[in-house]
Amino acid sequence: MLKKKIIYKISSLKKLSKDSKFIFHNVKNNFDGFIIKRFDMSVATFYRAIIGELIKDIDKIIYLDGDTLTYGDLTEMYNLDMTDLYFRGIREYRPNMKYTNVTRYICAGVMLMNLNLIRKNKVFEKFKEYYFYYANKGIYGNVIIVS
């Protein structure tokens, strides 16, 4: 749970842009009993798999990792056609990925997500299955599962 001081600091950013909006969710740990066997992952990594369940009134979002900086307007990215797509993202170069036949990867830290289609086709349920099965074995990271 975020401390009140941190929530206040984040909320104060609203004065930089009148169009910005901050919503804070207290998230239950839906990953109880999940053992992470990779040094470069935390349970927070897996919350992108349930974001559609947390934000039910929004159909499309831009997902950015917390360590991602943006400069400029993201409207053009947000307005990309997502009619039949779950995700749009930036291609990531991964020539030596083990244990997979996936040949095209997207960067899981910067994505446009069609939450409406994802919810309709229950894609997040499938993601959770993959996360629990593969990522818990230390084989796949978030890049593979999203790709």
Regions found by a protein language model. Name each.
Residues 1-147:
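Glycosyltransferase catalytic domains, chiefly GT-A lineage
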